Amino acid sequence: MTVLEDRIAMAEDSGELTLDAMFEWLEKMPVPEGYKVEIVGGNIFMSPQRRTHWQIIFNILDQLRARYARQRLMSDVRIDFPGHLNGFAADVAALAEGFEPDDRGRLRYQDVEFIAEVISKDTATNDYEPKLAAYAAAEVPAYLIVDPYTGKWHLHTLPKDGEYRGHQSLDFGYEIDLTGTVVGLVLKTDEFPRD
């Protein structure tokens, strides 16, 4: 698909929409500043970045620096995941040492060791359902959902056969023990703000 001045025309012989075409189209749209855009299951979602949201993201990134070099940490960068048209821009992604972009210069889901998503009210279902399934299918070793509305975090580990076998949920204030995963450290949550 290619984007023209006033319409979208299908350019591929198959007539099927692709993630590349959808993101190309989005790049030409007037997305409001401060909004995150993702494609989940072929649907486009835009959500505002709130102060609380960013504080939690920054806190996690800051703690991950004890184990990961800066260039191995990403936030809001497109990574395509298994499933139908899943182009996610995770709040936090930690990549394996020696990761290499693909031939198009994009990050590969196979290099992701850790994902954290800080939920937004309007897109929370994505983090708890389709993204959970996609990250498990991609065998991301550790997927953390942080919910500033309930003051809880949910850690999913041990991906196998498209689902996570390990799950732990606790309140803010309790540490997130990732020592049994490739991440190999403990995250503190006592400074996570609530919405």
Placement of each model-derived feature along the sequence:
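Gly/Pro/Ser/Thr-rich low-complexity, intrinsically disordered segments predominantly at protein N-termini
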Residues: 1-195
